[in-house]
């Protein structure tokens, strides 16, 4: 009971003060690009082939809109917790203090922590609400992968130009190059995170009997 509440509070704090804070800085940059280049015309590609005109700003606005929607959903999701004893029946609680309404008391306590009360559980909280957040993070990460892919192609097409950073080596044999390594790393890191999040979402929601 203590652990599921403690971990939920840590996760909640991490999402708010680390993940969403970092993501907000990315959203601000994309918003700046969308506004600054709203009239910068370029040729769009469908299936990798020349299509119709678009603007760089509009394409950035698409990613901003997608991220904004998912972030709003994430902020609205709550984490469920339990405080109902060894097998979720408040048995020991009731034996010790039979005159207390334990369901109402534990709900009030958990709500005060900014969490949601799950009254029907086994020994462990089912983690469905946590899995829901994991899946949503996967969607956000997939949007970031899509963004990184497109930025990689904009650089390749010469639409965007990278600035050389002192101390960075573009290539072991071609030092004149500036490879889009940060976007490539972002793809890999987000993909790895998604693999772990999907596994955790699938694993944590399965429990043998009461545990």
Residue locations for each model-derived region?
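Conserved, well-structured ligand/cofactor-binding cores
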Residues: 2-211
